[in-house]
Amino acid sequence: MDEQRSKGLSAALSQIDKQFGKGAVMRLGDHNAIKDIEVYSTGSLGLDLALGVGGLPRGRVVEIYGPESSGKTTLTLHAIASCQAAGGTAAFIDAEHALDPGYAHKLGVDLENLLISQPDTGEQALEIADMLVRSGAVDLIVIDSVAALTPKAEIEGEMGDSHVGLQARLMSQALRNLTANISRSNTLVIFINQIRMKIGVMYGSPETTTGGNALKFYASVRLDIRRIGAIKKSDEVVGNDTRVKVVKNKVAPPFREAEFAIYYGEGISRLSELVDLGVKFDIVEKSGAWYSYQGHRIGQGKDNARQYLKVHPELAANIEQRIRAAAAGHPLAFAEEVESPQRSAS
C-alpha cells in the first residue's frame, strides 16, 4: 500500500475508533488485542486463548448459545467460579428455574455467596439485572436463559393468544438501558440463549436465536457451543467433546475455535486440554497411545495422562505456562477448523 493510501486508512481507522469505540475494526491476524481488559476465565484454557484476551471481558455483554445439553450453563458456572476466586461477587438469574446447586458446587462455585433470583416474568428478571448492575457491587451476572424471559402480558394472557414480537421488544428496551450501566460499573453480563429453526429457509442456516436481534447487536462476544462427540470409558459415556466458536468478538479478532472435554459431574477438564494443546504445540509428545513430556512417559491413553497430571500439579502448571507462551506467538492457532470424531477416554 502506498504512503498516501496508508495515511488515509490510518485516519479512517482513527475516526472509527473515536466514533464507535476502540476495537470496532481490527486486523484479523493482529494478536495484540485491546490491552488492559479485565477478564474472567471460562474454565477452558483453549477458549480463553481463542477469545484473545484471556477470558470473558468485564464491562461487556456476552451471549452464549447452542443446542440443549451442549454445555452453556457449565461454561457460565466456571466463569462464576473464576469471578468468586478473584474475590468478586456473582449473581445467577435463573429464569428457567433449573439451576443444580450440587453441580455448581462441584465446579467450584461458592454457593453461600452466590446471589440467585428466580423471577416470575421477563420484565422482573431484566429489572433485577439492571438494579444489580447499577449497584456497582456485582462483578458478574448470568441470565439463564433469554428464551425463558416471558413477557408479563404473555403470562397473564390466555393460552393461544398471539404475542408476536413482545419478547424482542422487551430485550431491545432492556439492553438499551443495560449497556450504558454495564460499561460504567464494569460488570460482565452473560446471556444464555437457545436455538430455534426458521421455517421456509431454502439457503443458508435455518438456525436462529430467541429474543430478536437486539442481543446480537449489543453483545461484544457471542459464543456458539456444540457437542461434537461422546467420551466413552469402556461402554459407558462419561462426558462430551465440545467445540466453541467465537462468532463475534469486539475485543479481539473473531472466528477462532476451541475444543475441550466436559465430563459429567466434573465440568470442563482442564487437564485433558493440557494434553491436547500440549500435543498441538509440540510440547507433549505422542507416540501411538503413549504421551510423554520431556522424555518421560506420563500415560498410555489420554485418560491416564490426565490422571498423571492430576497427581503432579507442578508438571501441569509447567505445561500450561509453555502452552500460553507458544499460543502468544501463534495468533491464528485457534482459527483452524478440525473435524473431531468420537473418541474413547481410555
Swiss-Prot record:
Q: Which UniProt keywords apply?
A: ATP-binding, Cytoplasm, DNA damage, DNA recombination, DNA repair, DNA-binding, Nucleotide-binding, SOS response
InterPro entries linked to this entry:
AAA+_ATPase (IPR003593), DNA_recomb/repair_RecA (IPR013765), DNA_recomb/repair_RecA_CS (IPR020584), P-loop_NTPase (IPR027417), RecA-like_C (IPR049261), RecA-like_N (IPR049428), RecA_ATP-bd (IPR020588), RecA_C_sf (IPR023400)
The compartments listed are: Cytoplasm
Q: Which Pfam families match?
A: RecA, RecA_C
Q: For this protein, what is any one GO molecular function term?
A: ATP binding
Binding positions for ATP? Answer: 66-73
Q: Please, one GO biological process term?
A: SOS response
Q: Pull one GO CC term from this UniProt entry.
A: cytosol
What NCBIfam families does the entry give?
A: tigrfam_recA
The entry's function note states:
Can catalyze the hydrolysis of ATP in the presence of single-stranded DNA, the ATP-dependent uptake of single-stranded DNA by duplex DNA, and the ATP-dependent hybridization of homologous single-stranded DNAs. It interacts with LexA causing its activation and leading to its autocatalytic cleavage.
By sequence similarity, the record places it as follows: Belongs to the RecA family.
Name of the protein this chain belongs to? Protein RecA
